[in-house]
Amino acid sequence: MSFLIVANWKMNGTRSSFVDFIGKLNNKSNEITSKLVICPPFTSFQSNIELNNNIKIGGQNCHHKEFGSYTGEISAGMLKELGCSYVILGHSERAHETDSEIKLKSETAIESGLHPIICVGENSEDYKNKKTKEVIEYQCKNRLPTQGKYTIAYEPIWAIGTGNVPNNDAIAEVIKSCTGKKHIIYGGSVSSENIENLLSIPNLSGVLIGSASLDFDHFYKIIQQVEKKFSLN
């Protein structure tokens, strides 16, 4: 599997900025071997947008039901119809979601032909109390689907948007505790300044990038460092 680079735009960007961003990526695609997934707001989706083979579109959430009276929600099937291949699930910024709801969403996503990226991560209190492994193992047990292809995104809640990142040994320990649980990527304050260090972590399958993915030049610097790393291997 190619190294996975996921851009989570959250509630940022417009349709025109998304089209411009994708156009720039398409122009650079012959220099990129990594798999790129861009997750803009729903309003930016265009089902007819031209994408080169290594660029995919993802959603930032989906409901576990196919349709119904769920104001403000979107189904996995709707995302698929809009041209999505991936969907981020269980992000900590989505308040009050239970582990069982996240599991249902992941199973529905797979049934609809999407590849779920399922977030796990400890809060600052659990981190300080050295309960990271315990929390991650519990979340994996209760959030992950029983079958199908998926990716785990280890994104410690205390690291999101703070500029703080766990040391490589701590991330490697989480990956080790998830052995046999498919592919594992890291998210939480990923930037062009720390990506080189993160790339030295054994068995890391990719990265989930937030604010650093909004600026094309910054995002492309990250891609270039990933490409440099794997071209030397």
Swiss-Prot record:
Q: Which reaction does it catalyse?
A: D-glyceraldehyde 3-phosphate = dihydroxyacetone phosphate
Location of this chain's protein in the cell: Cytoplasm
Entry GO CC: cytosol
Identify the EC number(s).
5.3.1.1
Locate the active site: H91, E155
Q: Name one Pfam family in it.
A: TIM
Q: Does the keyword Cell inner membrane apply?
A: no
Q: Per the record's keyword annotation, is Isomerase included, yes or no? A: yes
Task: Please provide the record's keywords in A-Z order.
Answer: Cytoplasm, Gluconeogenesis, Glycolysis, Isomerase
Among the GO molecular function terms of this UniProt record, one is: triose-phosphate isomerase activity
Database matches in InterPro entries? Aldolase_TIM, TIM_sf, TrioseP_Isoase_bac/euk, Triosephosphate_isomerase, Triosephosphate_isomerase_AS
Enzyme class at the top of the EC tree: isomerase
Q: Which residues bind substrate?
A: N8, W9, K10, G161, S189
Query: Which GO biological process entries does UniProt record here?
Result: gluconeogenesis; glyceraldehyde-3-phosphate biosynthetic process; glycerol catabolic process; glycolytic process
Primary place of residence?
cytoplasm
Which pathway is this protein engaged in? Carbohydrate biosynthesis; gluconeogenesis; Carbohydrate degradation; glycolysis; D-glyceraldehyde 3-phosphate from glycerone phosphate: step 1/1
Gene3D superfamilies on file: Aldolase class I (3.20.20.70)
For this chain, the family text in UniProt reads: Belongs to the triosephosphate isomerase family.
- Summarize the protein's role: Involved in the gluconeogenesis. Catalyzes stereospecifically the conversion of dihydroxyacetone phosphate (DHAP) to D-glyceraldehyde-3-phosphate (G3P).
Self-association state and partner proteins as the record states: Homodimer.
What protein name is recorded for this chain? Triosephosphate isomerase
Q: What's the gene? A: tpiA
